[in-house]
Amino acid sequence: MLTRKQFELLKFINERLKEAGVPPSFDEMKDALDLRSKSGIHRLITALEERGFIRRLPNRARAIEVIKLPDLGGNTGGGRRGFTPSVIEGTLGKVRPPSHSHAEDESDRNVAVPVMGRIAAGTPIEALQTRSHTISVPPDMLGSGEHYALEVRGDSMVEAGILDGDMALIQRNESAETGDIVVALIDEEEATLKRFRRRGASIALEPANAAYEVRILPPNRVRIQGKLIGLYRKY
């Protein structure tokens, strides 16, 4: 049995994974549960991990995956059966393992997403014409629109569960809402993956790592090139 706070945190993490493809930061968890400090979040996460509901990736800061949800039946909270993590695992690009009888059909329906390079300073997305390879992604992971993948380099987003070496799945988009994690092109030179927020007339590009500073820029220096919709990770 989970306590109310444990269930609320598990539900919040799961919903954020489904919506954004990455887990919330500890500060976001603290605010969502109306706790005064992050130490309470640490205790709740430890309890959820001990009970087998989540997994923290070893040697990776605050990278969390939901392993299962409680079978709540008619209880409040709307638990779902058959849950699997939102992060795509391994090299097959499966979000949820298909039943044996439908395995081949599921594989045939997967979408080949082009890997357009690395998300690092120096190269605008449009200039990356050579596609190194593709990754196979379930169509329900993508939704509508045009998509591409970028290899993440660096640790500036680790507290959002985005790790060095991950493949970021990006939906092409020229606009963003506050809180979205976006591919932003700065001064037509530097591409970066950061959380987008508006601060008055300016744009804030926020890292998810206390070692990095928030960048505050005027809108004419920032061009949105896509929004993060998920991650492809090899183990």
UniProtKB/Swiss-Prot annotation:
Please provide the Gene Ontology terms (biological process) for this protein. Answer: DNA repair; DNA replication; negative regulation of DNA-templated transcription; proteolysis; SOS response
Cleavage, annotated site positions: 121-122
UniProt-listed Enzyme Commission number(s): 3.4.21.88
- Keyword Transcription listed? The answer is yes
**What Pfam families would the database entry show?**
LexA_DNA_bind, Peptidase_S24
Q: Where's the active site on this chain?
A: 156, 194
Top-level lineage group: Bacteria
Annotated GO molecular function terms are:
DNA binding; serine-type endopeptidase activity
Q: Which UniProt keywords apply?
A: Autocatalytic cleavage, DNA damage, DNA repair, DNA replication, DNA-binding, Hydrolase, Repressor, SOS response, Transcription, Transcription regulation
- Reaction catalysed? Hydrolysis of Ala-|-Gly bond in repressor LexA
Q: Which residues bind DNA?
A: 26-46
The UniProt entry, under Gene3D superfamilies, shows:
Umud Fragment, subunit A (2.10.109.10), Winged helix-like DNA-binding domain superfamily/Winged helix DNA-binding domain (1.10.10.10)
InterPro entries in the record: LexA, LexA-like, LexA/Signal_pep-like_sf, LexA_DNA-bd_dom, LexA_repressor, Peptidase_S24_LexA, Peptidase_S24_S26A/B/C, WH-like_DNA-bd_sf
Q: Which family does it belong to?
A: Belongs to the peptidase S24 family.
The UniProt function text for this chain reads: Represses a number of genes involved in the response to DNA damage (SOS response), including recA and lexA. In the presence of single-stranded DNA, RecA interacts with LexA causing an autocatalytic cleavage which disrupts the DNA-binding part of LexA, leading to derepression of the SOS regulon and eventually DNA repair.
- NCBIfam families, per the entry: lexA
Could you give the subunit structure recorded for this chain? Homodimer.
Protein's UniProt name:
LexA repressor
Source organism per UniProt = Rhodopseudomonas palustris (strain BisB5)
Taxonomic classification, please? Bacteria, Pseudomonadati, Pseudomonadota, Alphaproteobacteria, Hyphomicrobiales
Gene name of this polypeptide: lexA
